């Protein structure tokens, strides 16, 4: 006999049939007599009509819940948002962020190339940390080149192999893509310059961003408005970096990465927080115009307007609720009575129209060892399951 309780469901005694207890989960008889719940995951919304981006994906990465979606699986050139993967591969292969790296002639970019850069010179000596800031703030293609060559060389050395260090780095980028289970992403360079075989999707770029921003050094660099350091080497000088993400500090945005090419349009990835949850928002192919010299015209750049519109719509159309007594009175006490706890206590994101009529049902199986899953917390709006949380046995081993 198991006792399951939930506000508005009342107290129910269940005599559990053997084939049900085999799964350790049961359903309240008061629910069993009603119509079956609707699907538990709501569909992401279409972005507002004034958003110009060709592809959009917004996801609560903590809850794993998509919020907005437009052509999320369309392969597109990501421009310099590529550098999120570059940064991730660097981080995955770095233990000492103060390790010194020397720039070579192959890394130098000229202003006439119309490439973003930090202005390094051959012979300049940087720490990996400094180059990470150059990668994430100024979107320096020269910083990407130095890092790719350095990390690629380390990988070759560790393998006892020879070859082109930059090519080895690109192999590692695509190996990381495969390890993340991404099927519509492929890279041919570390900086994002256009190539028809260099692509990702809004959905998969959001996955890459979530992985990258989970690295403290990447998140810290991406969240800095400015950064200043002095180079070492034959031409010591002060380098001042400025973040290209104009949304930093606005609308809750705490980090981000821009990218722009004629072939890509204006691209932007941002990280923001809602009730402790991390939200990743991606726009690819926002409107932007270029002059006769193929220089972007900032006054025509719509990516920041697109992102602001998405965030504004998000805060109106969704609500974040905590699985505790504030939003679910009595839940904490009931968990204590049964000596169980939630295995996941992050905020639940719901459509705004669902957030005002919530109730819960605690499904429990027999007691088990501490930290073993013994049930599920179901969150309902009407008869629709809108969220689930694992319930674990409390106590100590």
Region spans (language model):
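Hydrophobic alpha-helical transmembrane segments of integral membrane proteins
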Residues: 15-17, 80, 252
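Domain-terminus/edge residues, biased toward the C-terminal soluble/receptor-binding domains
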Residues: 194-199, 203-204, 209-397
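Active-site-adjacent loops and short helices of periplasmic peptidoglycan-processing enzymes
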Residues: 32-203, 209-216
């Amino acid at each position: 006999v198991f006792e399951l309780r939930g506000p508005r469901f009342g107290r129910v005694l269940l005599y559990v049939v053997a084939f049900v207890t085999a799964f350790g989960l049961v359903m309240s008889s008061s629910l069993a007599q009603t119509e079956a719940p609707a699907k538990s995951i709501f569909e992401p919304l279409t972005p507002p009509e004034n958003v110009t981006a060709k592809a959009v994906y917004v996801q609560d990465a903590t809850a794993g819940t998509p919020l907005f979606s437009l052509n999320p699986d369309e392969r597109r050139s990501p421009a310099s948002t590529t550098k999120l993967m570059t940064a991730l591969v660097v981080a995955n292969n770095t233990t000492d962020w103060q390790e010194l790296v020397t720039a070579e002639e192959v890394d130098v970019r000229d202003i006439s190339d119309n490439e973003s850069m930090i202005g390094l010179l051959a012979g300049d000596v940087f720490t990996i940390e400094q180059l990470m800031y150059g990668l994430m703030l100024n979107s320096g293609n020269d910083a990407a080149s130095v890092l790719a060559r350095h990390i690629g060389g380390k990988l070759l050395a560790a393998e006892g192999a020879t070859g082109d260090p930059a090519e080895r780095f690109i192999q590692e980028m695509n190996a990381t893509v495969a390890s993340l289970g991404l099927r519509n992403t492929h890279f041919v360079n570390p900086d994002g310059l256009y190539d028809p075989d260099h692509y990702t999707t809004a959905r998969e770029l959001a996955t890459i961003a979530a992985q990258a921003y989970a690295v403290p050094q990447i998140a810290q660099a991406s969240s800095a408005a400015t950064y200043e350091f002095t180079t070492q080497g034959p031409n010591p000088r002060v380098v001042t970096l400025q973040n290209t993400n104009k949304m930093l500090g606005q609308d809750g945005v705490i980090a981000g990465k821009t990218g722009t090419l004629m072939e890509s349009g204006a691209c932007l990835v941002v990280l923001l927080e809602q009730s402790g949850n991390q939200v990743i928002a991606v726009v690819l192919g926002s409107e932007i115009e270029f002059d006769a010299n193929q220089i972007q015209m900032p006054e025509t750049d719509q990516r920041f307007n697109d992102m602001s519109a998405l965030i504004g719509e998000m805060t109106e159309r969704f609500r974040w609720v905590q699985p505790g007594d504030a939003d679910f009175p009595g839940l904490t006490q009931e968990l204590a009575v049964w000596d169980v706890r939630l295995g996941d206590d992050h905020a639940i994101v719901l459509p705004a129209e669902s957030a005002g009529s919530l109730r819960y049902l605690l499904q429990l199986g027999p007691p088990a060892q501490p930290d073993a899953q013994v049930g599920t917390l179901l969150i309902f709006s009407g008869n629709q399951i809108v969220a689930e949380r694992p319930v674990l046995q409390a106590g100590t081993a």
